[in-house]
Amino acid sequence: MNVNKTVTIMLAAGLLMTGNVVATNKPAAVFTPEQEARIGEVAKDYLLAHPEVLIEVSQKLQAQQEQQQQRAMTAAAVQHQNVLLNDKDTPSYGPADAKVTVVEFFDYQCIYCARLAPELEKVIRANPDVRFVFKEFPIFGQRWPESVSAAKTGLQIWRQKGADAYLKYHNAIYATGHNEGKLTDADIRSAAEAVKLDASKAADVQGTLDEINLLAQQMGFSGTPALVVLP
């Protein structure tokens, strides 16, 4: 793939605002302690009288941070495009030669992933020429073990049953409406049984989860859902 092609990244995550320090070769002005105190009072009085200035500065800093984050993630997507697109252990749905691929990092217990799921299901149905890659990223696993169980079961279904069965399982888990700690082992078993997963032949997929977690870190993702669109 041509690395100059456009990479689009969308994610649900908070932004950390930071300021920029600009160095110049001009000598710094020297003020007496009294002058410094007076300057501080004037600045404080002005900001109290004009709080919109703080809002404007905050918005500008946030915009700068968004641009920096977008550039960093775009560069990471280009750098890791091979594993994003061609990892055989990662579930996918759609033509292998698709001109557009959508990669989703998600957790079945994530409420925002759950809200996105039915909309993404519509997109999949409406775009049979687009390939969708599903990166099981159970970030809530320490809080809710079922996040990891559901992710592992999904990967096992992918290996054993293929794309159609995986997508059916994936949608069935979200269709339970159980997230944020409400997903149960019974929910997972029911969805797996519906696609006839043979639990006695289930593969060990912890290594795949570890690789996805590492990839997410390299991409700069700390929350879900995260979507990467690659041409």
Ranges and model annotations:
Residues V3, T18, Q67-Q69, D187-A191:
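Intrinsic low-complexity, intrinsically disordered segments enriched in polar/basic residues
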Residues Q64, I139-P231:
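Cysteine-centric redox/oxidoreductase cores and disulfide-bonded domains
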Residues M1-V22:
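Gram-negative bacterial Sec-dependent N-terminal signal peptides
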Residues L16-R143, D204-G223:
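Extracytoplasmic thiol/disulfide redox context detector
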